[in-house]
Amino acid sequence: MKVKAEYIWIDGYEPTAGLRSKTKVLDGAVSSVSELPTWGFDGSSTLQADGGDSDCLLKPVWMCPDPIRGGENILVMNEVCNPDGTPHKSNSRAALVDIAEKFKEHKPWFGIEQEYTLMDGKQPAGWPQEGFPERPQGPYYCSVGAEDVAARSMVEDHLDLCLEAGLEAVSYTHLTLPTIYSV
């Protein structure tokens, strides 16, 4: 049975990098990230290589079930490497792994927070059609009720999908406006 592996990586844009992905079709299910092949991509389109020498490599480092496609399909997180296999300059994960290894006796912890705003057209959902909310930010933070919170079911779905995919999500927080959350 064919399986779709969505290879995901961080591009070279600055100051804010973006996510990129492409789908590789595998001949069957895999049980370990070590079974996944390294794969190439054109780094000139992601600001990770020049046009004349644009080969970059995707080195799988973590995988989880794909909660959207379901079945045996997977999401594959990758490090970006140069053609010779060394970490690309945009690959900050490789440096982090080196530091974590150097200080492993201290048992370092790393956390990532994904903060996002749900939009309605060109403005945050729940905002007045013209201008800004009449209230300051404080009343929205960790609040409850339809007056202060919007799209909570969407955020619940987001958290559920993270957990189903095996991500170590530990919380979500309603932040400073009706549709700003962090997971």
Predicted regions and their residues:
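Single conserved hydrophobic/aromatic residue that forms the stacking wall/gate
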Residues: 174-183
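Glycine-rich, acidic/polar active-site loops that bind/position phosphate-bearing ligands
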Residues: 1-175
